[in-house]
């Protein structure tokens, strides 16, 4: 009777615990590999375009580490052993790690693309934006601002015409975009560093809303300043800026 009602159930519980412990070790090991891979992505030290992706990955790693089940020493009582044989599912943690790691790595690639990109890259991506035409790059001989390649200034300035620009007097139609300047549509300015791009953006902001010298909209993306004409409506500026940014940051 003692064997049937005490020893046998205990032995079964012990066997189940050992089997469960082996499964936990395997699942812990698999999740730990994903944690290590995610941590390695962070430890590489590359910054993302969207810092939120880095924060999300950091949280996912922390949550995954907290979820790892600790395998204790074998309890003595049957009831305690059975209480440890609970189902273990790391699928939610695994999915969170995979998704946040992919988003972070994609954002890192995006920032690389908009960090001192080549003039050819900017022209190529700008050419994919709807209603943009007459794309022209400034040269040292022909640059409206006379600033190309100077210390702290842009290394490329790519002007363009925007087909939806309201131009009732025909001031900009039929003229080269580089002659129209930003007023005729917009311009993409490329800088060597984020600091230089931000300085340029801050300078332009001084003239925001001015009636005579109005820089239009301007936004820093990486080391690029996206500018659109002040003659566009606010919604047109926002939509065009967003489409240009999407084109520059699209990862193949």
Residue ranges and their predicted role:
Residues 127-211:
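Short, solvent-exposed recognition patches
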Residues 43, 62, 66-69, 73, ...:
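Sec-exported extracytoplasmic/periplasmic mature domains
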Residues 79-82, 86, 110-145:
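Solvent-exposed, charged interface segments at domain starts and junctions
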Residues 93, 118, 122-125, 196-203, ...:
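Stable alpha-helical elements in mature extracytoplasmic
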Residues 109-113, 185-190, 225-233:
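Second-shell loop/turn segments in exported
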């Amino acid at each position: 009777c003692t064997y049937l009602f005490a020893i046998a159930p205990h032995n079964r519980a012990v066997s189940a615990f050992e089997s469960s412990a082996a499964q936990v070790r395997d699942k812990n090991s698999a999740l730990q590999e994903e944690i290590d891979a995610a941590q390695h992505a962070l430890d590489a030290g590359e910054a993302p375009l969207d810092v939120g992706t880095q924060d999300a990955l950091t949280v996912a790693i922390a949550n995954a580490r907290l979820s790892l089940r600790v395998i204790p020493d074998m309890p003595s009582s049957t009831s305690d052993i059975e209480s440890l044989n609970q189902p273990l599912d790391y699928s939610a943690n695994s999915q969170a790690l995979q998704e946040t790691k992919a988003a972070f790595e994609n954002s890192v690639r995006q920032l690389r693309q908009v960090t001192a990109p080549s003039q050819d890259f900017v022209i190529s991506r700008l050419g994919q934006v709807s209603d943009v035409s007459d794309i022209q790059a400034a040269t040292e001989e022909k640059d409206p601002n006379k600033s190309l390649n100077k210390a702290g200034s842009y290394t490329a300035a790519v002007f363009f015409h925007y087909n939806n620009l309201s131009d009732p007097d025909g001031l900009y139609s039929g003229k080269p975009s580089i002659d129209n300047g930003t007023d005729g549509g917009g311009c993409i300015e490329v800088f060597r560093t984020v600091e230089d791009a931000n300085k340029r953006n801050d300078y332009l902001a001084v003239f925001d809303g001015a009636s005579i010298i109005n820089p239009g909209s301007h936004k820093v993306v990486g080391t690029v300043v996206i500018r659109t004409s002040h003659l566009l409506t606010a919604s047109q500026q926002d939509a065009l800026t967003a489409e240009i940014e999407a084109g520059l940051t699209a990862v193949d």
